[in-house]
Amino acid sequence: MAVETTDTLVVGAGQSGIAMSEHLSALKIPHIVLERSRIAENWSSMRWDSLVANGPAWHDRFPNLTFEDVHPDAFPGKDRVARYFNDYAAMIGAPIRTGVEVRLVRHSQGRPGYTVTTSDGIFEARRVVAATGPFQVPSFPDIVPGDAAVHQLHSSAYKNPGQLADGAVLVVGCGASGSQIAEELCKAGRQVYLSVGEHYRPPRAYRQRDYCWWLGALGLWDEVKSKRKKRHVAFAVSGYEGGRTVDFRRLAHMGVTLVGVTRAYENGTLHFADDLVRNIAEGDEAYFEVLRDADAYIARKGMDLPPEPEAWQRYEDPGCLKEPILSLDLDRAGIGTILWATGFRYDFSWLDVDAFDEQGMPLHKRGVSAENGIYFLGLPDLTNRASAFIYGCWQDAKHIADHIVIQRNYDAYTRA
């Protein structure tokens, strides 16, 4: 089988891979993008039916193409987002090959660069960009055994309330996915329990500006790490039903029963940490901190934005917060499904290079790996807070492309 060569091979054709291709093309760097499924596959198949983007259309896009059929302040649905990326890839003429799985990347023998083994043959590339993003492999906590008498699924496999087994549902995880799915299930008439861990809960909008705008105005997109994200916590923000602040007290008053972090399972009973009150309080403080910072910014800039006193009001504490549930017999509670909205983990098993620490996490600086010629793109906090978002990965891709130009100049040097 013939070996195909290129300068840069990009793995993944989601938002990161497409952004990378645009910048490589602009700098006339030969490259190929390999995608094991379809363009923007995660948006097409690993999302539930009612999902919308977490940011408004004016913000959650690449600079050179708008959502022409979506109001700038609206939140496009998952299928529209998938179509946006397909349209963008076509617009820039991205050299994407779909249905090609990258199985192994390792150093080439006796020559610079990397040998890439795929389902469609062998490629040789001087550089490889891992643009597979943060949503690689569903993460399941090892708590409830697979043979327990309850149906279990990950949020990436959830589509709508009708697919779930009869009975109540425990949603574990309170980020954008868990909070939206819990509300959707409650509105569908299900009894819902929501396991709430540490989270960052900003206002969806405040004083006529969306939270994405406030992130930019306050310089928070550029933070290397959010002040409240000393370690990973759930990001509770959603564009669900036109965009509304995630408020767990409001969900409780709708009928959702809040519990703390899911800790253990024994003989049909789940045990929860006694941390619900603290987790809710810390989420509240993050929310009010944004309001305080926004008010100070408006005053400092002399902006004419009307006050929003109702944003400072808080729902009364529900009973489940006053007297938290610490254990739950699944059978007695009638729970037929546990839905794990517990995020994803990385899988770089195909990348056989010295670019990872002892925990298997990528070693890099702004996406430039410790291994010469290997790059990472689209990971959370790669460069700053924006890096895993559409807005941010495009900027990071430009930095990586510029670095590749410099490396190509070194490669091309010959002594006069």
Feature annotation, model-predicted:
Residues 2-45, 75-416:
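Flavin (primarily FAD) cofactor-binding/catalytic cores of flavoenzymes
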Residues 41-66, 251:
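Redox-cofactor-proximal catalytic regions of oxidoreductases
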Residues 68-72:
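A short acidic, helix-capping loop that chelates divalent metal ions and anchors anionic groups
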